[in-house]
Curated annotation (Swiss-Prot):
Keywords: Amino-acid biosynthesis, Aromatic amino acid biosynthesis, Lyase, Tryptophan biosynthesis. Pathway: Amino-acid biosynthesis; L-tryptophan biosynthesis; L-tryptophan from chorismate: step 5/5. The lineage of its organism: Bacteria, Bacillati, Bacillota, Bacilli, Bacillales. It comes from Bacillus cereus (strain B4264). It catalyses: (1S,2R)-1-C-(indol-3-yl)glycerol 3-phosphate + L-serine = D-glyceraldehyde 3-phosphate + L-tryptophan + H2O. The keyword Amino-acid biosynthesis applies. This is Tryptophan synthase alpha chain. NCBIfam families: trpA (TIGR00262). The active site is at 47 (proton acceptor), 58 (proton acceptor). Its EC number is 4.2.1.20. One of its GO terms (cellular component) is cytosol. The keyword Transcription regulation does not apply. GO terms for molecular function: tryptophan synthase activity.
Length: 258
């Protein structure tokens, strides 16, 4: 469990496809079924969003999914319960994407206890500044759960080195300035940014935000170690276009042989 399980997803040159699902969107049975599907389809890690009323980093698709979940009465405890149940059936690593507020409202010690029980391997907290990460970092380290760092295009390299120096799991490299969502293409400077991050950190680097096509996936995994696909996966799951998710996974894995 934990850090080692995430490491294994990148071993021997593996490229990681990390889909994002919103916890409780469509109900808990649907969450469990979607995790089972993604596991069987060959995803490397699954990222599960904790819905929050003020999701500052999320684009419209993920915001809508979070609102649907909250409007239907989804709770953090309910998401953990669903993960506890589905964990008995799947081995895929779980990474939670949560804003800081739900963690503190739930109680950080209680939150981490539930993470352990649900077999959560890593956590991403997009609104937790590096300077304040000890709010939960030391507690997570004690129980071998990775606190995944985010770095952005605007982060100076010194800051990237600082942010990632004590981190575990992988580095989440945000590939656009702004919020998540589907985009047509990526600017040339994104390539040099990813190459720069890769050359300065000792962890796998995963690109995320705005990745939505096979071409995007192929472009990104040529440079880095994997991709997170969020808004597009939510759209495809909503529209029952699961074959297209399998195609994105295949595009990722194809680059392992390259």
């Amino acid at each position: 469990m934990g850090v080692e399980k995430i490491k294994a997803a990148f071993e021997n040159g593996k490229k990681a496809f990390i889909p994002y699902v919103m916890g409780g969107d469509g109900g808990f049975e649907k969450l469990k079924e979607r995790i089972r599907f993604l596991d069987e389809a060959g995803a490397s890690i699954v990222e599960i969003g904790i819905p929050f009323s003020d999701p500052v980093a999320d684009g419209p698709t993920i915001q809508r999914a979070g609102k649907r979940a909250l409007d239907s009465g989804v709770t953090v405890k309910g998401i953990f319960q669903a993960l506890i149940e589905v964990r008995k059936e799947v081995q895929i690593p779980f990474v939670l994407m949560t804003y800081l507020n739900p963690v503190l409202a739930f109680g950080k010690e209680r939150f981490i206890e539930n993470c352990i029980e649900a077999g959560v391997d890593g956590i991403i907290v997009p609104d937790l500044p590096y300077e304040e990460q000890n709010i939960i970092a030391s507690l997570l380290r004690e129980v071998n759960i990775a606190l995944i760092p985010l770095v952005t295009v605007t982060s100076p390299i010194e800051r990237i080195e600082k942010i990632t120096s004590e981190s575990e799991g992988f580095v989440y490299a945000v590939t656009v300035a702004g919020v998540t969502g589907v985009r047509q293409n990526f600017k040339e400077e994104i390539h040099s940014y990813l190459e720069k991050v890769k050359s300065h950190v000792n962890l796998p680097v995963v690109a995320g935000f705005g990745i939505s096509t096979k071409e995007h996936v192929e472009e990104m995994v040529t440079i880095c170690d994997g991709v997170v696909v969020g808004s597009k996966v939510i759209e495809l799951l909503e529209n029952e276009k699961r074959e297209e998710i399998c195609e994105l996974i295949y595009a990722t894995k194809q680059k392992e042989e390259a």
